[in-house]
Amino acid sequence: MTAQTKAKFQASMIPLIAIMTALTTVLTMLVKLPTPTRGYLNLSDAMIFFSAYAFGPWVGGVIGGLGPALSDLLSGYPQWAAFTFVIDGLQAVLVGLIVRKFRPANMIAGSVIAGVWKVFGYFIAGGILSGWGPALGEVAGNAGQMAVGLIIAYALFAAVRKAYPPLVRMGNLGVQPTVTIPEDDAAASNQQTGVSDETATAKPDTPAGAGH
């Protein structure tokens, strides 16, 4: 990838990150179940997992961290925003790094490992903000939120991967484009190597009786 191509690719990522961050924020705010630690359960995991599957660890990490953190700020939970950015962002990074193949077992295992980190991270954050008792009581709820998000994300990613492959080519699980060599380039290559089109495409004569 040339420097110019790389710069164009990076510039094209900005609108994508902005759109996906906005979608993640909205979905996180759409369903909110208040918890004893003055936080709330939500559907952010679905977009965190999807972003990591589709766009890889680093872009997914930015989306996964910013979207839920903005939801905290807009929903009246500013004390959680910094914790959310770090915990959810690292969750997406872990998923993007661990999950390498589009296979249910691989995706579930990697996502569960990242989900365990999230449950642990929110337990620590909840203990700091509201005490260890209430934080311990939310472990089951956070685990359930992770499981629901994983199911939604897997179904959504599988559908998008099939319907519109270019959207998910940046991640490890995307459908990679097929590389074809234009005829003009192939002809030029043959000329450089001294091979004519006829020679390149001709099949050698098979002597009579030489077949198997």
Question: What is the predicted function of each stretch?
Answer:
Residues M1-H212:
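Loop-helix junctions at membrane interfaces
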